[in-house]
Each structure stands twice: as C-alpha cells, then as structure tokens.
Amino acid sequence: VECCYGKQTYSGEYSDAHELQIGLTLMQKVLIELNKLGLPITFMAVPGNHGENRKNGKSYTDFMDNKDIAVAWYVENAFQYDKKLYKQFKFIYPNHVEDDITLTYASNGNLLGFAHGHQFRSGGGTLALGKAQAWHKNQKYGDWEVGFANILNYGHFHHFSILEDPQLIIGAPALDGGSKWIEQTHGKRTHAGILSYTIDKGGANNIYIAKKKSHKDFG
C-alpha cells in the first residue's frame, strides 16, 4: 500500500481501497495460472511496513493489523468456496497477534526464511545486503528459527541483491518500477522485476529475474 507516509500524499495513483483490490486480483490471477501447471502450490506471505495500520504516518496497533496479511487472508477465504480448487493450495501466513512477522519453510533439505526487510534497521553498513546479513546473524544469536535459514528471502529495498557468505541471502526486486527513496538514499536504480528460482538438495538454482524497463511491460 502506497501513500502511507506524508510525503507520498500527492504521488499515489490509486486510493487505498483500489490498491487492495489490485493486490487481491493480482494474487488470485497468479495462483490460478500457476494451478494450471498441475503442481502443489504453497502460498506464503509476511507483513511489511506499507501494510501497517497507520495514524499520522506511524503504526499504532499490533504487528498483525496489516493489509499485507489481510489480502492473503482474503485470497484464501475466496478460494475456500471452491473446494476442488482450494485443495490444490497450502496457505501459510502469520495471523495471530502473538505470531512472528517472519516465516520459515523446509524444502528439499533447505530451510527457507522469509522477511519483508523493513526490520533490517541497524548493523552491516548502509547497503541492504549488509543490513540483511547483520539482522540474520542476530536472529540466529537469539535462537529464532528464521536465523537458521540457509536461504533468506526479503524485499523492501526494491532492487535485486544476492550474497552467499556462507548462507544465501536474496533480495527480491519489486514490480513498482522504481523507488525515489531507495535511489536517493542508497544510489540504487530500481528496475521492475519478478524473481524466481528452483530448490534442490544443493540449495538454490536457476535464479532468474524477469526484468523490464517498466512494470507496464509485464502486461
């Protein structure tokens, strides 16, 4: 959800309601298309900073009061009315007030970790990968499950990044076609893109970025 900060008031193209409708429609269409492959599908979602319920630009409720999680729930709830379709999917996302804002998922001998990335607040310098690595180390030090992931996935910073040192840390690109904030604070040009990769016992393979000059090129 955009326009959740004061400086974005006049830069958003859509209202809050329309953004939720677009997100919901996009998720549903992607899942329906993936279902045509005839493979079991696991849908996972974690809350990010733009989904937070805000007042005067500040989050003031709990971590699960988040539009990112709400949209995930809307998608699952809609699919439940088609039992034949619903059984093809597994939905995983935090929803209880006591849940963590990260997820882990075991696949082919790997433990995948998922975090939006807004919680990478300190340590590791100014680059996103350094912040992600410092955060990941601290999670392991605190004995949190996501800290033991050998493949950590995050977003938030809009551009693709990757580090293997020795755990694999992957920053996914965004579809928005650019973030003025990231460009001005990190010097990174953020191109619209979709990240995909495969998993086997050896880890992540076939890492691919479907990248275009603009999100409009994905139509």
Task: Report residues per predicted region.
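Charged interaction patches that mediate protein-protein contacts
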Residues: 2-9, 207-219
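Acidic carboxylate-rich catalytic motifs and surrounding loops in phosphoryl-/glycosyl-chemistry enzymes
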Residues: 40-49, 89-101
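Core catalytic region of metal-dependent phosphoesterases/phosphodiesterases
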Residues: 1-81
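Short, solvent-exposed polar/charged micro-motifs at secondary-structure junctions
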Residues: 54-55, 102-107
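Conserved beta-sheet core of the metallophosphoesterase superfamily
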Residues: 35, 64-99, 108-210
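Catalytic phosphate/metal-binding cores of nucleic-acid and nucleotide-processing enzymes, i.e., regions
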Residues: 21-24, 43, 105, 213-219
